[in-house]
Design a protein with these regions (language model features):
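Glycine-rich NAD(P)-binding loop of the Rossmann-fold in SDR/ketoreductase-type enzymes
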Residues: 22, 52, 56-67, 101, ...
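Conserved catalytic-core motifs of eukaryotic protein kinase domains, centered on the activation segment
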Residues: 49-55, 90-93, 134
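NAD(P)H-binding glycine-rich loop region in Rossmannoid oxidoreductase-like domains
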Residues: 21-62
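NAD(P)-dependent short-chain dehydrogenase/reductase
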Residues: 104, 116-166, 172
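Conserved Rossmann-fold NAD(P)-dependent oxidoreductase catalytic core, especially the SDR/UDP-sugar
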Residues: 66-102
């Protein structure tokens, strides 16, 4: 596969475009002219940061996935959008895909509003664990690796996430 990244800075790992997601005109042009098979949206504002930055979370978590779907609607380009299992609060359990998304935090609600539900595009709803390019990242693996001594955590908890490697394989199959 030919893979191109989109980030604020060009990547040292893959060919990429440096641009801000708020520059929707440039992004629309890049996607339209690129004639891509798939656009994978991994942009998002996570948990606590979303709670402190409602406007940013609303744009990136809620509006932006629908912007991508709109840009690609008259093309063969499919959008694969990353959501989260946090759209469900977990209070009831045994959720199905079509259940009401009862997450209660701003993060949960902003991610729920961003989910794409149509015949063309795909929303992957999960949590992930894996290496983080940012040494100060808030991911589960980074958190675990920075702990010293006894680690506080949960008991009798079920986690439905997958590794970043498995997520990449899932995305490849979905594309």
């Amino acid at each position: 596969h030919d893979v191109y990244g989109f980030d604020l800075r060009e990547s040292q790992y893959i060919d990429s475009f440096a641009c801000n997601a708020f520059d929707t005109d440039t992004l629309r042009k890049v996607i339209t002219e690129g004639n891509y098979d798939t656009v994978i949206n991994c942009i998002g504002v996570l948990n606590q940061f979303a709670e402190q930055n409602h406007a940013l979370a609303s744009f990136l978590n809620s509006y932006f996935p629908h912007f991508l779907a709109d840009v690609t609607k008259d093309s063969n380009t499919q959008v694969i959008h990353m959501s989260t299992d946090c759209v469900f609060s977990g209070k009831r359990g045994s959720y199905t895909e079509s259940d009401f998304q009862d997450g209660e935090t701003f993060y949960d609600r902003s991610k729920a509003l961003g989910e794409l539900n149509d015949e063309k595009n795909i929303t992957l709803r999960n949590s992930i664990v894996g290496p983080d390019i940012n040494p100060k990242g808030i991911g589960l693996l980074n958190w675990f690796l920075h702990q010293e001594g006894e680690i506080n955590g949960y008991t009798k908890a079920m986690w439905t996430g997958q590794t970043t490697l498995q997520l990449a394989k899932t995305m490849e199959q979905a594309a």
